[in-house]
């Protein structure tokens, strides 16, 4: 079977990028699929994740990001020009490859793909929640996105909660959780270190500013504890400077390939995301024996964390409750260890060998109908 994924670039450290690489690697290694990924902005950058040599990476050399060098008017003109060029090159590649299935994770690709794909099944991977925007412009954009997404042969969501919303616009919605890198050693956190951990991209979605604000209150009660944040993104420098200026025992790190060591050397994992379709890092942390404190953001955390058993789910933006639960764990080593043990057991629900057969089944269903 010949599969084409479409994505902007694999050059960044990020959850979507890692998941795409993992899935493509699995499809070529275990199922013998012929897999391509077509990018618009990869350029000469290499992926920080190990992409199997059998996966064909084709970059269309568009460089959408370069338009931001111009003023607003010129930026709009450049975007239209680049979009036309992108669609022309994308159509040419699809005609040459002649895939069995096309998969996209970005909404702006759906409409042009529907026009150029012919009878090929189109799969839309939803790595963002079906959000309910609060501005007129966003509501209009959401309606447009939903209209075109609803015409795809399949929409794949990460959680049942997200799927319920998508079923308002499509009858072809499937739930397939993300693949997760779980701790596959016998080494776990003993929950005795005075370290709290966050891992994620430094962007608005992760709501890191609120986490830092919560930590200010925690630090007054537990000044000998440390908050470690690992990740990258456009807000990294901003939060690095903010954390350094506050001087409240926060250390901000760039991504590392040895992230499992960071999990095992910590005692509590925290997440304050505004929305989290799945939350890869939650089961990762749990598999290393960490209890998790997370906002109950739509829709991922509640599908992974059992509140009061292996972690705590906090109502959105209740900073006081969030801080109280973190302090509760910091002040009770036995509770940390008990919840950590249960977290290890809970993490086993998302093993990779349960996920990829679901994709294989979907692909076979779609190709049998085309």
For the regions a protein language model found, what residue spans apply to each?
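Nucleotide-activated donor-binding/catalytic signature segment of Leloir-type glycosyltransferases, i.e.
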Residues: 240-255
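Short hydrophobic beta-strand element within catalytic cores of glycosyltransferases
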Residues: 291-295
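Donor nucleotide-sugar binding/catalytic pocket of nucleotide-sugar-dependent glycosyltransferases
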Residues: 124, 146, 150-185
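A conserved mid-protein helix/loop that constitutes part of the nucleotide-sugar donor-binding site
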Residues: 14-22, 194, 198-220, 234-237, ...
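Aromatic "clamp/platform" in nucleotide-sugar-dependent glycosyltransferases that forms part
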Residues: 274
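Short alpha-helical donor nucleotide-sugar binding micro-motif in glycosyltransferases
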Residues: 149, 255-256, 262-266, 359
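N-terminal strand-loop element at the rim of the active site
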Residues: 5-13, 26-77, 165
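Conserved acidic donor-binding segment of nucleotide-sugar-dependent glycosyltransferases
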Residues: 306-308, 312-320, 328-333
